[in-house]
Amino acid sequence: EMLDFLSACLRYGVSICVAGATSSGKTTVAGWLLSTIPERKRIFTIEDGSRELQLIRERDGRVTNSVVHTQTRDSENERQRIDQIALLDIALRFNPDIICVGEMRGPEANAAQEAARVGIAVLTTIHSNSSEGTYRRMVSLCKRAVDTPDDTLMGYVTEAYPIVVYCR
């Protein structure tokens, strides 16, 4: 019942952050949630380095859903480097129903919460030691991008992600 509730929230545009320690099942939960999204919804995924989410659905050799998978690319040449912030900017141009940021680890947390606060459903994962500490962790990551008071950022991230799921 809980997973069905979370799936319904995401389908209807509610952003969700899946938190937990390393190997706690965050990506598995996020992948399952995305697999329940109707084929007519446009999904844009952003993954750092390697692709873990497999969301393309096929029927009779034809793709039946609308998914854009993207990955970051590191490079010593700054012009060839593609980070999560750049991919979030690109995602917004695609008019997606859902953006999935594979894992927030740095200043991209600020760009992700901004996207979530303008009406795009954002599904993301984050490393956190507790459910209570998840929003504080988001604030600390956002501060890597902006010099905004903690209480203001706390208001932003709680508005952006009304649901936090903690995996043990």
Give, region by region, the residue ranges found by the protein language model.
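Conserved lysine of the Walker
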Residues: 26
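Hydrophobic positions on the alpha1 helix immediately C-terminal to the Walker A/P-loop
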Residues: 29, 33
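N-terminal pre-Walker A segment at the start of P-loop NTPase domains
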Residues: 1-7
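Conserved NTP phosphate-binding and transfer environment spanning the P-loop NTPase/kinase superfamily
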Residues: 157-158, 162-168
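P-loop (Walker A) phosphate-binding loop of NTP-binding proteins
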Residues: 9, 21
